[in-house]
Amino acid sequence: MARQAWLYNPATANKLLLSDPDTGYLCTQLDLGFPTVRDVVNNKPDQHGTDDRTKYLGNRPVTMNVTAYPGGSTPMDEIPGLFTDFMDPSMRPELHVIEDFPGAPELVIVVRASAYTGPLVYPARIDMQLSFIAPDPVLLGATLQTATAWAGATVQGRVYPRAYPWTYPPGSQAPVSGTIHSNGDLPVQPLLKVYGPATGAKISFDNNTYVVALTSSTINAGDFLTIDTKTKTCVRNSDGASVLNWIDWSNTIWPVLAPGVDHSMSMTAISPTGVTQTQASWQDGYLA
């Protein structure tokens, strides 16, 4: 598969290839740059060296050089206008990239325009340079990855007091764990959807190395919680009502799951049924 790259503006649903020979332009260079590093450094007062507590990345510069030439289906002087939809700094277009190797993932990063030049050059051509800043420096796999852990069902036997016709609840079901695996370069902090019925739910990773614990609050059947382990938020159902106080903070160790290895995810709860489950979702994160 040849390299592919394109811009997409969600606000206008406009997609534009970075290279389109039939239209009359080619991307001669796409530089994804490297994120700035947010230095947290202090000089040691009475000795050589520094105290370096640097951990995080800043934004990422992205540049692309595009050359327009005569003879395509679009007049050469109209081609710079094809890119202006992505150069409004109030817009947040997406840059999509697929590299040329077997199994290459589609990567996406949200960018913001920072500069645009398009000088007229002799012989007849236009050499454009588009510059962007990516506030979030991580290239994300476009495919949403998921894993599910089932709490299992514990109810079994006859229902009493006896009524006719006799009814039997579903038999017990063993818990089923899920597996989280990222092929990216950076750790995963998944988004969790916890489906009831469940009381005092607990989601464990790697045999309790990391734990997201809830208080004794009850998630009713048909309800769910959305827990973002990266931003540390918790909302109920789709209305966005915050239930952050349902997090048992004293027993929670937020997951930061290293890439390239399997991580187990399991769920326990009081009085679960066959539909009690936790679904984890994430996008693999890449530096380059």
Model-predicted segments: where are they?
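Short beta-strand and beta-hairpin "edge-sheet" elements
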Residues: 92-141
